[in-house]
Structures are given as structure tokens and as C-alpha cells.
Amino acid sequence: MKIGTQNQAFFPENILEKFRYIKEMGFDGFEIDGKLLVNNIEEVKAAIKETGLPVTTACGGYDGWIGDFIEERRLNGLKQIERILEALAEVGGKGIVVPAAWGMFTFRLPPMTSPRSLDGDRKMVSDSLRVLEQVAARTGTVVYLEPLNRYQDHMINTLADARRYIVENDLKHVQIIGDFYHMNIEEDNLAQALHDNRDLLGHVHIADNHRYQPGSGTLDFHALFEQLRADNYQGYVVYEGRIRAEDPAQAYRDSLAWLRTC
């Protein structure tokens, strides 16, 4: 299994040193912040060349969600995502992770009444994805549509929700990203959800049930990795979560070493 990581607070700030550190820890790739990539693309290229550590994907680094309630923010976000995809193409990255929104609204907390109808939600997200479909086609990249749990987003919560957008809009350059943490909240059966969407699953985020490092909680990574292998999953699995330990760096190393046994 190819395992990557997002940035962590204890990683070096210098870009080359960051890449060296991630490579030395034993990771196979780096999921970079989109803004960091765009603003430092030559340094990133140099770091990739020196270390051999690929930038697999981007996550974050733009302002405005593809399902934003505010049209100006949505359009601004699309422009920024376009630039990130162009930058990813320059450095050999595969694509960008995008949710419909994050932290914008939830039916689970007051006021519990959305300022937009569900049909309006579907129209905005679909319109955005059709725009990004063209960008991804032009740049040879992929948009990884991410379902989030019900407390962080109200529009796309399950892999089946993401699948519906892709199928109904006939999108060829949009795939699903499955995040074990969010899936553990929303899916009836994580392994079954992965299997049912194996044809569109292009990327995976991992954290344990409590959002901390894999191996420190209750998720059955052995079973989930077995499912991915059985379905011939060829993408990366990327650490996205926090670390709970007195020595975060050592705990991260230990988690990765343990995950390699799954």
C-alpha cells in the first residue's frame, strides 16, 4: 500500500527540509497544501527532484467552497482550485481533494435551517464540478470529491452521495475520496462502502476513529486494507489527522510502522 501524509506541526518549515523529513520517516508521498504549492512551486519542484518524494495530491489552500452559499466566494474558490490543479500538473501530482464545504452549515446544530434549498445545493455543487471537470481534463488531473461527516457538511456525507454527483453529471475526471474518519461516522459498513464504490474510489484519507493517528483507536485497519487490496485499489492512502502523544514525531513513526503490517 502506498502511504502518504499531509503536513504536521512538527515537520520542518523549510520546504526542502520538509520533504527530506517526510521521506526519512518512511512515507511514499506528500499531500501538500494547495496554497503552499502555488506560492512556492519552484522550491517544491526542486525538493521533489532532490528527494524523489512525489507530491501526490493537494488538499486545502483555497478560499471558497464548491458548494458555498456566497456566489462570489464559490467563484473565487473555483479560480484558486484551477490554479492548484495547474500547479499539480507541473509537479506531477494526481489531483486535489475537495469537499462540498467544510464548517459552513450543519443540520445537526442551530439554526438547523439552511439558507438554501437542497435542490439549490445540488445545483451549485454540480455547476462547480462541471467547471472543474473541464479544468481537470485540460490539466490531466483529477478532482477527488470528499464526503464529510454530518457535523462538518450537510451536502455530501457518504460515498454514495459523492457517487451520485459523479454519475448524474457524467463526470470523467472526478473520483471519490474515502476518509476513514468521516466514513466511521456516516457509513453503515466501511468495508462494504469501499467495495460498492471501488470503480470510482481514487484516493483515501486515514485517521483512527477519534481523528488521531492510526493504531491508537478502534478502527480495524487490517480489514479495511484487506478490502482495498481485494478491490485492487491502486491509489494512495494519506494520513490526515492529529497526533495524541507526548512525543508526536515518535508516535507518528510508530503508527506508520504499525500500518505497514496491516
UniProtKB/Swiss-Prot annotation:
Keywords: Carbohydrate metabolism, Isomerase, Manganese, Metal-binding. The gene is ycjR. It comes from Escherichia coli (strain K12). It holds the Pfam family AP_endonuc_2. Mn(2+) binds at residues 146, 179, 205, 240. It is an enzyme of class 5 (isomerase). The keyword Metal-binding applies. It catalyses: a 3-dehydro-D-guloside = a 3-dehydro-D-glucoside. Binds 1 Mn(2+) ion per subunit. GO terms for cellular component: cytosol. This is 3-dehydro-D-guloside 4-epimerase. Substrate binds at residues 182, 211. Catalyzes the epimerization at C4 of 3-dehydro-D-gulosides leading to 3-dehydro-D-glucosides. Probably functions in a metabolic pathway that transforms D-gulosides to D-glucosides. Can use methyl alpha-3-dehydro-D-glucoside and methyl beta-3-dehydro-D-glucoside as substrates in vitro. However, the actual specific physiological substrates for this metabolic pathway are unknown. Cannot act on D-psicose, D-fructose, D-tagatose, D-sorbose, L-xylulose, or L-ribulose.
